[in-house]
C-alpha cells in the first residue's frame, strides 16, 4: 500500500461511536461496542485561583496508575482523545474553544492503564478510547472525519549520520522537544526514549502540517542537539536545522490530511 494511504488509515484505527467516517475517508474497522470507560470521572469549570498543579494542567497530564488529569477547552479535549493537532479539529460553538474545564478521571482496577508506573505526557491508546467515550457521554459529542489532499512534510533519512543513541532509561516516558524561547526558537532539541513516529508528531505541532515518518528508523532513542541561534524567531528554519543535525531530512509533499468535524457538542454535565 502507498505509505501516504497507510498513514491515513492509521488515523482512523481507533474511532468511538461518537464519530463516524465521512464519505471521503478510507473504510476502517467499526468501533467496538465494549469500548473501555473510566470507572469515575469528575468535570468542573476551571478555577483560576486554584494553585493545585493538576487543577492548572494545560492539556493532558497522566499520573501513576493511569489517572488522567486534563485542563482546557472541550475542543482541546477532542484533540487529545483522537490524537490530532489543533488544525485538524474544526466546527463546534465558540465556547468549545474558549471555556476551560478540569477533568479528573480514574480507570477501573482491571484496566491495563492501572499498571502505568510513571507520569505520562501522552495518553495510551486505551486512555484515548476512554476519553472518546467521556466526550460522547458527558459532552454529547457527535462528529465525523473528512480526508482531503493537502500539503504535508515527509520525514526521511538525510545524508549525515544519525545522532540517535540507545535510551539511558528505557522505562522513561517518551519525550521529544524542540525548545521555544520568548524571542523565538533557538534550535535546541532533546529526545528521551522516543521514536521517530513520536518525533514526527511533535514536529508537526511546530510546523502546523502533518509530518509523515518515512525514515525506516525503528526502536526508541535518546538525542540531544545544542542551540545554534538564540535570537532566531523563524520556527521553520529552526526545525529544519534540528532535523538536519539529527541526520534526517524534511521535504514538502502532497498527501492525505484528516480533519475531525464537530457536528454537535453540549456543555458537559458538571460535578
Each language-model region and where it sits:
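Beta-strand-rich assembly/attachment modules of structural machines
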Residues: 2-271
